Amino acid sequence: MVAELVAEGRLRLVDGTLVSCANYPGCASHSHFAGHASYGYCPSKSEFVWGMRLVLIADRKGVPVGYDLVGPKTGEEREAALALASAQAGSVLFADGGFWGRELDASLELIDVELVTPAKHKLGERPASEIAKARIRLVIESVFSNLKLQMRLERHLAKTLAGLVQRIAQRLLALTLGVFLNALIGRPARALAAYDGR
């Protein structure tokens, strides 16, 4: 059952989200995250966050396949996606517009990974292919939603980089087990509210 969940098809989804590391004045120089974290813009909240970016690759059911923590800049996110995709040769990688770029596309082609992103230009009518891409992208968005809401990713309370890595790994393990349990009992894969504990 686990092998079926992890190795289902060639489809992989990649995205990143900012994880706040500290939010007090002077945190950039006095925190244990100094030298690792920096300021980055979070478009979903319309604010700047001092922290790191979690880059996650998941399969089409939402099971995490790999992750990396990088600085919050877009270039670092692309490098992390390339490093994570190197273990996914022969797969089709769905990403949002932030991963669009000829350099990343060419680098992924060298390791036999096809990158699929939304159309770069807004079209008057959304073609069926763009709607299908958006539906597939909802899977990774729901994974991040579960991590942030049910598993309180943004309230990790980590004081060091090692502590942050440990807390993220715990949440990803809990997410994977939740998806696995849902598959065993026939529930929707990412419906984790029953395991919330609230």
Where do the PLM segments sit?
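A general structural signal for well-ordered alpha-helical segments in protein cores
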Residues: E77-A81, I140, F144, Q170
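Structural motif
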Residues: S44-E47, L157-I168
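Polybasic low-complexity intrinsically disordered regions
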Residues: M1-E114, K120
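A generic secondary-structure signal marking the coil-to-beta-strand transition
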Residues: G9-R10, I136, V143, A169
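C-terminal domain-tail junction helix/linker
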Residues: Q166-R198
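Residue-level signal for secondary-structure boundary elements
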Residues: V6, V92, R155, L181-I185
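Helix-centered, glycine/charged polyanion-binding patches within enzymatic domains
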Residues: V92, G97-G163
